[in-house]
Amino acid sequence: MLFLLSPAKKLDYDTPVQAQTYTQPLFVEQAAALIKVLKTKSADEIAGLMSLSQALAELNVGRYAAWKKTFTLDNARQAVLAFNGDVYEGLEAPSLSASQLDWAQEHVVILSGLYGALRPLDLMQPYRLEMGTRLETPKGKNLYEYWGSTIAAYLNERQEGEGAPCIINLASEEYFKAVDLKTLKARVVQCVFQDWKGGAWKIISFHAKRARGLMVRYAIEHRAKTSEALQAFDREGYVFDASASSADKLVFRRRLD
């Protein structure tokens, strides 16, 4: 069983990390080809393409210029420790033990516009390139066309030999669209997190993102082997709602009031 996560825009390359174990990213050549395209863009063009402020655009132009095909602990950091958005605050990877990180390495995949798919301990140089960016490349007009069936084929390879391959999708729609479902062999189970607000159950973006990270943390701590094992998830007030769920959609709800 594999858990899919989105990356985060917010990165942390400053906080000291304990983990010295790392692996090399798998799609370096594909990432290098994207960097080559990005290096042709000015800060103004990057700002327009990615809807960034001038300061952020200039920061990322600098990142593309500094990017190298060689990844070390001097120029990169393990992906799960570098991402720092709502999902990763829920996951709290820095507090995972070495054996828990090893389990995550085998069961968690982080989707990425630049790197395609990252394992938690894969080294990652800082970047900004969201999957929905309309970056034209020789392969097409956007990143979905660039990655094509590559990510799905990789996920198939990861689950080769498993009797009933299953993917728990905790990624956003923007990122999951990069997984070609015609190529993918595994059953996909979606996790939905809803809060009661204004008299109705709603997906509140900030809470849902954090909950995705909490779910991965729960799976790591319990070494979850099946989607059924996730039904016991109860972090921060969420409870599995069987009546709102189906075999391929697990709905968790909580009342904040």
From Swiss-Prot:
GO terms for biological process: response to hydroperoxide. Pfam families: H2O2_YaaD. One of its GO terms (cellular component) is cytosol. InterPro entries: YaaA. It comes from the Bacteria. Belongs to the UPF0246 family. This is UPF0246 protein BAV2675. It comes from Bordetella avium (strain 197N).
